[in-house]
């Protein structure tokens, strides 16, 4: 898919930030396709998934109107986006804009006797210079034995975190990042 191509390019090298510090103001770094363009645009893909289409496009319109015929920094975008959505994206920007690399997920799941479904989410980082932990909403899709589906969102705030959620059918499979909503490489999901 189109997004998978971006993921493959971005994760082809473990490190690198979207943010370009003043000490790195060289044209090859400012216009780096993997970091400035591909990883930078993937931050927008993730933000769109996190806030939903309507909120995302309204926030983009507000930002565009606010900075029309002017210049803006990444922090100007963050402030405008937060004002439009009413959400705090400090941790997101610390991890994804200023931080290097990306998380690699290992997710274990099991269905309980009451049909609820439990998950254990662990993550490692692509490089030791990456943030110690990427706080992130995680997209999960559960498919049932009769074809039912449930799209779940796990708010992953710590490593080795456990979740138990209600489910009204018998699960046959679980998919993670099923529409490439977030940036990760080779996640594993096991029962």
Regions inferred by a protein language model and the residue ranges of each:
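Hydrophobic alpha-helical and helix-loop surface patches within well-folded domains
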Residues: 1-121
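Residue-level marker of positions within ordered structural domains that often coincide
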Residues: 49, 98, 124, 145, ...
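Composition- and surface-driven signal marking solvent-exposed, interaction-prone regions
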Residues: 58-62, 132-136, 154, 188-190
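Beta-strand-rich binding/interaction modules
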Residues: 103-105, 109-176
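Extracellular cysteine-rich microdomains
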Residues: 146, 190-191
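Short acidic/polar inter-strand loop motif in beta-rich domains
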Residues: 178-190
């Amino acid at each position: 898919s189109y997004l998978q191509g971006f993921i493959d390019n971005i994760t082809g090298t473990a490190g690198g930030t979207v943010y370009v510090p003043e000490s790195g103001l060289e044209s090859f770094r400012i216009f780096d396709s993997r970091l400035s363009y591909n990883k930078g645009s993937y931050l927008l893909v993730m933000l769109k998934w996190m806030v939903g289409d309507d909120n995302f496009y309204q926030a983009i319109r507000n930002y565009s109107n606010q900075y029309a015929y002017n210049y803006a920094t990444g922090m100007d975008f963050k402030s405008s986006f937060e004002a439009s959505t009413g959400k705090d994206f400090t941790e997101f920007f610390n991890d994804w804009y200023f931080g290097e690399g990306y998380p690699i997920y290992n997710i274990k799941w099991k269905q309980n006797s009451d049909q609820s479904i439990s998950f254990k989410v662990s993550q490692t980082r692509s490089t030791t210079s990456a943030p110690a932990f990427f706080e992130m909403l995680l997209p999960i899709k559960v498919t049932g034995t009769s074809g039912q589906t449930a799209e779940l969102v796990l708010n992953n705030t710590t490593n080795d975190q456990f979740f138990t959620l209600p489910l009204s059918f018998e699960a046959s499979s679980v998919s993670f990042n099923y529409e490439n909503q977030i940036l990760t490489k080779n996640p594993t999901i096991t029962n």
